[in-house]
UniProtKB/Swiss-Prot annotation:
Subunit and partners: The complex is composed of two ATP-binding proteins (PotA), two transmembrane proteins (PotB and PotC) and a solute-binding protein (PotD).
PANTHER family in the cross-refs: SPERMIDINE/PUTRESCINE IMPORT ATP-BINDING PROTEIN POTA, SPERMIDINE_PUTRESCINE IMPORT ATP-BINDING PROTEIN POTA
Reactions accelerated catalytically: ATP + H2O + polyamine-[polyamine-binding protein]Side 1 = ADP + phosphate + polyamineSide 2 + [polyamine-binding protein]Side 1
Originating organism: Psychrobacter cryohalolentis (strain ATCC BAA-1226 / DSM 17306 / VKM B-2378 / K5)
SMART domains with a match to the protein in the record: AAA (SM00382)
Cross-referenced Pfam families: ABC_tran, TOBE_2
GO molecular function: ABC-type putrescine transporter activity; ATP binding; ATP hydrolysis activity
EC number: 7.6.2.11
Protein name: Spermidine/putrescine import ATP-binding protein PotA
Designated gene of the protein: potA
Amino acid sequence: MTESLLTPLTTPASANTDKVLLQLTGLKKTYDNTEVLKDINLDIKHGEFITLLGPSGCGKTTLLRLIAGFEQPSAGAIYLDGVQMAGLPADKRPVNTVFQQYALFPHMTVAQNVAYGLKLRKVPKVEIQTRVREMLAMVQLEHLANRRPQDLSGGQQQRVAIARAVINRPKLLLLDEPLSALDHKLRLQMQSELKRLQRELGITFVFVTHDQEEALSMSDRIAVMKDGRFQQIGTPIEIYETPANLFTAKFIGETNLFKAEVKGVYPEQPDRDGRVTNGRIEVEVCEAQVQDGPTPVRNLRRPDFANDVQVGDIVNLLLRPEDLRIYDPNDKEHGGLLGRVIESNYKGSTLDSIIELTNGHIIKASEFFDEDDPSFDYKLNEGVKVSWVDGWEWVLPEEDIH
């Protein structure tokens, strides 16, 4: 009796197991005296979907090639299920890779392409037929089993490539920007398909992309890379809401950054009920004029780096477009920064407003659109006031990101 393909090989990600499958320790890679990977350390759990995210040239594809065995590290170690992979060639590792170019065999049918790896392993014919049938059903291509790759759409070809990669039940599947050649609508569809397949099969996925939306929508964790180093490793919510530095803040999603001067730092202290508060800092936003006098002091939650902050220091306030609120400049109820609308983009459920503050700084606000609310009828060059709720911002220290 053959094992069903639908039986997870590993514990699915939803079980949140803590068992480590892949361990990268002190990895370095050097080409011609240029270090392209610098002290990479990462533990990846069984059944996890983790994304290596970063701009072109950050080292993410090089790291994937080291894991796959296509290249060897200059230093450090790679452990897969506790076994050292150093020196082991790619074809000897329980790892499969899906590339941007799917490399399907044009002279073979869809079913023959998917079965190819099983035939190389001399799996019995009856078992091959069963597993191919199950795999094609899982990727919803059973009705195309006898088609040639050139007769398929881009999304269908990609699903064939994934089916061929996972039918061998690898412990680890590596995906190098497999969605980048697809159009936007199909890319969104395939994001859902990939996550569904990963969850049902329970195979650990390491996904490489430069697309922040792909990373945020599919990943259990994201490892943000720049210049051969990890900048931050965390869940999509952690990466988006609490970026570790200015690079991550600017690279992930759309960002408004405001300079502010620290006016007071207040340490943790017990409240009236004896509970310890997180403390707070007071800042004055440096960006622009406000109505009726100087910029007010804002009372903010105490950032993680508050022990290193002194009165007079400059910090960065991170606010996403959806955090900002727009008011009439004559509104007396809300304080805020003055500016004018220089562009307005209707996107169905939201209205995006590009605003130039009085000092020339350009920011973006995104609000849910309400056609019955006259306050949404912003005209170009119309004066507005921009504000936010204290506590919605994320505070980062001043740094040089170049």
